[in-house]
Amino acid sequence: GRANRLAVTVMQLGLNVKVDDHLVVPGQDITITATLTDYGVRDADLVMFSLEAGDWVRVDLVEPVNREVSEKGDASVTYTPYIPQDLRPTIPHEEMLFEPHFLEPQYTVVARVKSASGTLELRKPILLDVAPPVSVAFVEAPYLIRRGIDDTAAMNILLTNHTPGAKSVTLELSVPKGLSASQKKFTVDFASAGGQKIVPITLKLAKNLEARDYVLSATIVGSDASAEGIARVVDLEIPHDIRVGVIQSYDTTFINTLARFNVPHEALTIEDFTPERLDAFSTIIVDIRAYLVRPDLVANNQALLDYVKRGGTAIVMYHKTFEWKKEFAPYPLSLGRNRVTVEDAPITVLEPKHALFNTPNVIVATDWDGWKQERGLYFPSRWDDRYTPLIDCNDPGESPPPGSCLITRYGDGTYLYTALGWYRQLRELHPGTLRIFANMLAL
């Protein structure tokens, strides 16, 4: 309690605990060294150490041991507990967040010190990361497969050795009907702990695959370590003969999506704001909040507008109110704080014959289903009459101006400002968003 903590402070006692390995696997022995130090006047003579374990850890109890405090003022003890075979993994953290005991220490070192004022107790919890001997993960899943166009799909499986020393395992692949792999078992050898190996997989695709998710699984034979990877088959047309420049912010979604599309693309730098460089691109994407983090864009915004005027297409993604100036756009455009937080809020297409909804992919009502998080935020609240609103969307009971997707002709080119959360959906390979994004590239 409080009195105990106060007495420990007054006596200037400290308990230091060292663990030889904080990332452990079931079946491993670890070494815990605990040292009690009396930093003040020597008033601690005898220390009783004990090692406690959480009731879910189930280890053999270790009898408390007494240690005399040395002339230097310290006393130490070493424990070598065995990590039980059935101890649940805690990594990867993002998958284990809601497991029982996720953030609870598996062990606690307790030091009880006898003094003139009674017995004082110091406690030091030990939180370990528990890993399977070898972990397995699909890299960059879900995988995009274009129905009727792709006849093979390549993917990578990452194996990581957490076992101290060398390790050899067998990886077994399970493939759903419609996909096939020439090899389904792989032997993987590791020289030491922390080693990683990539196992490349090539799948053959049956003709006339249905557009849906196909779930693959990879398992380390003889263990509980496994992972699932989704191959997402999508009806998707991608425009030909395009080249895309991205004025990137802190996000990589658009670059990653263009790579998945196999579309030639480049991340633009300060050296690229010249007519010769910009005109090399059919479309330039201004990434989310780029005007906040790219001062070179702010300084060279006129070069971007001139690019549009000469016939280019600029697609500007969402920004927050304070980082946007209405003169960034070719005609005045002011951002508000309107947002649509309901992820399945109805979408009304205001210009159904517009190319954005028809070329090369025809967009239908179901393309808007299954969004993650909100529809969008910081929608434009006022804009010049030369913009055409393409989409209306609002939360129930609200009716903000339809500014979530505004398009205009400027000179010989096209300028699109859109505050919808496309990037979140593209990260997830949302099929409808993939189709609309491909249509944006064709504007």
Walk through the language-model features, giving the residues of each:
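A glycine-rich, often tryptophan-bearing local segment used as a flexible ligand/cofactor-contacting loop or short
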Residues: R289-D369, T418, G432
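Alpha-helical scaffolding within the catalytic cores
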Residues: T269-T274, A299-Q302, S399-C405
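Extracytoplasmic/secreted envelope proteins and their assembly/folding machinery
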Residues: I255, L278, N301-L305, L434-F437
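Aromatic-Pro/Gly-enriched surface loop or interdomain linker
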Residues: S223-D287, Y318-T321, T341-V342, R424
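Extracellular ligand-binding/catalytic regions of CAZymes and related secreted enzymes
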Residues: V130-D151, H162-T163, V169-L171, V233-E237, ...
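Long beta-sheet-rich domains in secretory-pathway and surface-associated proteins
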Residues: K18-H240
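Mature extracytoplasmic or organellar-lumen-exposed domains after removal of signal/transit peptides
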Residues: G1-V19, P26-Q28, G40, T414
